[in-house]
């Protein structure tokens, strides 16, 4: 007789283990599972655990050469989703040995790899991940983190202000640098390359880097404040990306930028290591995130992408506005904003946080609020995001009727007014509009901005 029982397997026999005690070293995942009609929850949950770890669809001879018990993923808990009939949350525990140290790429290849195309499931969404301390410690994380960034920039006690240079495509390098200078001169801390500005025929990267560096040094000299421009180093190859980062370092600028999802985690981690070694801050843009996180029942929630970025490395990351033109529910957004900034985050399902996460002193990331925001939003943004954030007004700066510099002045005056009001104990949520109106009496630039964008 054959030494093992051949044939197609019932996953739940091996991979559904409701009495399993999770280990401190396990990576834990919460999946929202929508099985095909007729597939029981236990089988679907077990299938997810199997397909994203050691399983294959049939019993194989080589299973006998290893210890499945040591290496298999386990579905250890299943709970129904309130208000959804055929949907539930499956909790899966993965032994740490399944993952390469310091590789977000490998972690995702396993956990969100082939399993998302699995036939027995109608849809699958990864809602949250618990990264164990032992695995966190294998990552460098953000190049510098929030405190070091404040020290480098000498800016304390308030959110930082940025602006994306528009029109995003079509300006020459010289005119682009001119727009950068105007914004920084007016009072912003940062300006930003748009995520799709890489190195195109109308503006090659080296020319842009040069003119932007000139603009920020001129603005720095005139304002006495440290200025930055996020130079987008994203490129078609890792070598080209590093070449751009090297040139930024040679120019002596404080910060570069990367599109971490389109560029990929391998490239991102490479750049993050370079940035720490060379004293550059790293701004991260999340272009492509909505492809992955927009669907409610398939894909990955952004909080998982945010956690992955903190491991891979970045000092700023775009994370929605709660107000403005891009969607984002307040509690949920604040949940992953805290995951980015804090050292320790408690499990709290009302904020979408399925697991308690301890970052064991990995530096924090500044959340960036960007997209359709303007001066009237300033009180709400200051209240929601607090000091440790970057508020980015693209059109909200460049759309000012008098030009970029006055637009920058309006934003800076509005921000300083909100911070001062908050420090005096006023309630930004209820008195916000009044605070902006009072400030606009002393600032014609702000008054003009208040006219253009109605409260």
Curated annotation (Swiss-Prot):
Cellular location(s): Plastid, Chloroplast
Binding-site residues for substrate, renumbered to this chain: 114, 164, 168, 286, 318, 370
Cofactor note: Binds 1 Mg(2+) ion per subunit.
Cofactor(s) the protein requires to work: Mg(2+)
Chemical reaction(s) catalysed: 2 (2R)-3-phosphoglycerate + 2 H(+) = D-ribulose 1,5-bisphosphate + CO2 + H2O; D-ribulose 1,5-bisphosphate + O2 = 2-phosphoglycolate + (2R)-3-phosphoglycerate + 2 H(+)
Superkingdom of origin: Eukaryota
Name of the protein this chain belongs to: Ribulose bisphosphate carboxylase large chain
């Amino acid at each position: 007789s054959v030494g093992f029982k051949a044939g197609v397997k019932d996953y739940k026999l091996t991979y559904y283990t409701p009495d399993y005690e999770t280990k401190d070293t396990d990576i834990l995942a919460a999946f929202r599972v929508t099985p095909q009609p007729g597939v029981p929850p236990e089988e679907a949950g077990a299938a997810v655990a199997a397909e994203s770890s050691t399983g294959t669809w049939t019993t194989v001879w080589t299973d006998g050469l290893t210890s499945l018990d040591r290496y298999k993923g386990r579905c250890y808990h299943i709970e129904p989703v309130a208000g959804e009939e055929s949907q539930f949350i499956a909790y899966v525990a993965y032994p740490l040995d399944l993952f390469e140290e310091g590789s977000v790429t490998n972690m995702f290849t396993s956990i969100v790899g082939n399993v998302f195309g699995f036939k027995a499931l109608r849809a699958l969404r990864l809602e949250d991940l618990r990264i164990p301390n032992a695995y966190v410690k294998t990552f460098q994380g953000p190049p510098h983190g929030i405190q070091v960034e404040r020290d480098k920039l000498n800016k304390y006690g308030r959110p930082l202000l940025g602006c994306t240079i528009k029109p995003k495509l079509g300006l020459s390098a010289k005119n682009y640098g001119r727009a950068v200078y105007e914004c920084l001169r007016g009072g912003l801390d940062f300006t930003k390359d748009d995520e799709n500005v890489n190195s195109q025929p109308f503006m090659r990267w080296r020319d842009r880097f040069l003119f932007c560096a000139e603009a920020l040094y001129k603005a720095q000299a005139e304002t006495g404040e440290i200025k930055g421009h996020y130079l987008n180093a994203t490129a078609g190859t890792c070598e080209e990306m590093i070449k751009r980062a090297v040139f930024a370092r040679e120019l002596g600028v404080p910060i570069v930028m990367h599109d971490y999802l389109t560029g990929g985690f391998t490239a991102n981690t490479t750049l993050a290591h370079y940035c720490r070694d060379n004293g550059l801050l790293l701004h991260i843009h999340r272009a492509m995130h909505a492809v992955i996180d927009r669907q409610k029942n398939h894909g990955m929630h952004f909080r998982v992408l945010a956690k992955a970025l903190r491991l891979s490395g970045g000092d700023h990351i775009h994370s929605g506005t709660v107000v403005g033109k891009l969607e984002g529910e307040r509690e949920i957004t604040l949940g992953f904003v805290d995951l980015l900034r804090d050292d320790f985050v408690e499990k709290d399902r009302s904020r979408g946080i399925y697991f308690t996460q301890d970052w064991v002193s990995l530096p924090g990331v500044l959340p960036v609020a960007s997209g359709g925001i303007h001066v009237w939003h300033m009180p709400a943004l200051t209240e929601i995001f607090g000091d440790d954030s970057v508020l980015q007004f693209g059109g909200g700066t460049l759309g000012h009727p008098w030009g970029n510099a006055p637009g920058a002045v309006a934003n800076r005056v509005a921000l300083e007014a909100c911070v001062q009001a908050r420090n005096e104990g006023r309630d930004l949520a209820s008195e916000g509009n009044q605070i902006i109106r009072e400030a606009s009496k002393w600032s014609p630039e702000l008054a003009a901005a208040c006219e253009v964008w109605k409260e």
